[in-house]
Design a protein with these regions (language model features):
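Short cysteine/histidine-rich zinc-coordinating motifs and their immediately flanking basic loops
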Residues: 29-30, 258-268
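Beta-strand/loop nucleic-acid-binding surfaces
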Residues: 291-316
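Nuclease catalytic cores
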Residues: 9-58, 251
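A non-catalytic, helix-rich entry segment at domain boundaries
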Residues: 49-128
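OB-fold/S1-family single-stranded nucleic acid-binding modules
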Residues: 325-346
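Structural detector for short beta-strands of small beta-barrel domains
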Residues: 263-290
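Polybasic (Lys/Arg-rich)
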Residues: 213-248
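Mg2+/Mn2+-dependent nuclease catalytic core
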Residues: 121-216
Length: 346
C-alpha cells in the first residue's frame, strides 16, 4: 500500500476503525473490490445537487443528470451485473422530495460550484467543496461549506442520512479536522461547526480550540502509525475485525483476519472461503463446488455456487472467497452485487 502523504478526515475515521481497511484502500491490486453502491450513488447525487442549488437550468434537469451519471457509474462498476434502478435505491424518493424543497428555498441563486481541485482558497467566503491543505501537518480535507454568518465563522458538512440529528462522534471529529484546516488557512478559528441535512436543518456545536488541536494531533499519530506499517509490514495484529467495522467493508473476501474472527451471530452478509473441487458451465452459468475453509462454523462442509461472477472459471485446487450472495452453505446463487476474489496460492 502507498504511504499517506496527506490524511483526510475520512481516512482518519477509517484507521480508527481498522488500519487494514485503509491499507486495502491504498493497494492498487485491490481496486477491483472498490465499487460504488446504491447508497454511495445517492449520496453523490445529493451532494452534487446541493452544490448546484439555484442553477438556472432548474431542479429537474440537475437532478436527472446527476442520477443518470451516478447510475452509469454504478453499472460500469458492476458490469455485466445490472444494479437496481435509481427509483429503488433506499431513500431515493425522500431525498428527491427534500432536495426539491431545498431548491425552492434557495430561490434563483447562482450555482453552488467551486472546483474542488484548487488548493488555494479565494479571497472571500463562502468556500464550497474547496480542498484545504495544512501548511505544516500531513492533513488535508474538503469541507462542504465554510461561510460567515453575522460575523461568525461556520464550517458545515452536508449529510444525506434520513435520520440525522446531533453530530455523531465521527462526524464531530471530521468537523474538528476541517476547523483546524480552516484555521491554518485563514488564521481564524471557526466559531461554530455543524452538520446540515437535505431539509436545511443544522445541528451545530461551539468549536473548542483545544479539541481541534487534539483532533489534529490524532490525525498526525494515525499518519505515523500507517506509514510505519507501510514500511515494515501490515501484520494481522493491526486489523480490527468487528461487526461495525466489517459490515460495509468491500474487502471482506480478501481479509483473512475478518474471516478468522467472524462469528455466526454477526449481522453481516454471508462470506465464505472455499477450495474448489469442481467447476463447470451449465445453461450459461458457472456451477462451482468446493470445500469450505472459513468461516469456522462451516469448515469442511460442501459449498456449491451458481452463477457467481468469476473472472474465469476456477480451476480445481484454487481457493476463492465470495460474499453478498443469496442462500448459504451448502448452496448459493449469485445476486447482482455478489463479489468473488481468488486467493493467491499458498
Amino acid at each position: 500500500p502507498k504511504p499517506i502523504d496527506k490524511i483526510t478526515p475520512t481516512e482518519l475515521i477509517a484507521i480508527n476503525h481498522c488500519l487494514w481497511r485503509v491499507a486495502f484502500d491504498r493497494d492498487t491490486t485491490m481496486a477491483k473490490l472498490r465499487r460504488s453502491t446504491p447508497a454511495t450513488a445517492l449520496g453523490n447525487v445529493v451532494h452534487l445537487v446541493m452544490r448546484k442549488l439555484g442553477d438556472p437550468s432548474g431542479f429537474d434537469e440537475v437532478w436527472n443528470k446527476a442520477v443518470a451519471d451516478a447510475y452509469e457509474r454504478l453499472n460500469t462498476d458492476w458490469a455485466p451485473a445490472v444494479p437496481p434502478s435509481p427509483e429503488s435505491w433506499p431513500g431515493w424518493s425522500l431525498a428527491r422530495v427534500r432536495l426539491r424543497k431545498a431548491w425552492a428555498r434557495s430561490g434563483n441563486r447562482s450555482a453552488r460550484q467551486s472546483p474542488a481541485s484548487k488548493s488555494t482558497p479565494p479571497a472571500s467566503l463562502p468556500w464550497r467543496e474547496r480542498r484545504l491543505e495544512h501548511p505544516r501537518l500531513p492533513i488535508a480535507g474538503i469541507p462542504d461549506l465554510v461561510e460567515r454568518i453575522d460575523k461568525q465563522l461556520w464550517v458545515i458538512d452536508i449529510k444525506t442520512g434520513l435520520n440525522q440529528a446531533d453530530p455523531s462522534p465521527e462526524q464531530r471529529l471530521q468537523l474538528l479536522i476541517y476547523c483546524g484546516l480552516v484555521h491554518a488557512t485563514l488564521g481564524e478559528m471557526p466559531t461554530y461547526a455543524a452538520v446540515e441535512t437535505t431539509r436545511g436543518d443544522r445541528f451545530s456545536f461551539v468549536v473548542d480550540r483545544d479539541e481541534v488541536e487534539d483532533s489534529l494531533g490524532s490525525a498526525v499519530e494515525a499518519v505515523n502509525l500507517f506509514n510505519s506499517a507501510a514500511e515494515n509490514g501490515f501484520t494481522e495484529t493491526l486489523a480490527s475485525p468487528a461487526p461495525d467495522a466489517c459490515k460495509w467493508c468491500p474487502y471482506r473476501t480478501a481479509c483473512r483476519p475478518f474471516l478468522l474472527s467472524c462469528k455466526k451471530d454477526w449481522e453481516i452478509s454471508h462470506t465464505v472461503l472455499f477450495r474448489v473441487t469442481s467447476a463447470a458451465v451449465h445453461d450459461h452459468r458457472s456451477v462451482v463446488e468446493g470445500v469450505v475453509t472459513l468461516p469456522n462454523w462451516h469448515v469442511n462442509q460442501t459449498f456449491v455456487s451458481v452463477g457467481f461472477p468469476f473472472e474465469e472459471l476456477p480451476s480445481v485446487g484454487e481457493t476463492w472467497a465470495a460474499t453478498d450472495y443469496v442462500g448459504g452453505v451448502p448452496s448459493a446463487v449469485a445476486s447482482w452485487n455478489t463479489i468473488t476474489f481468488r486467493w493467491p496460492s499458498s
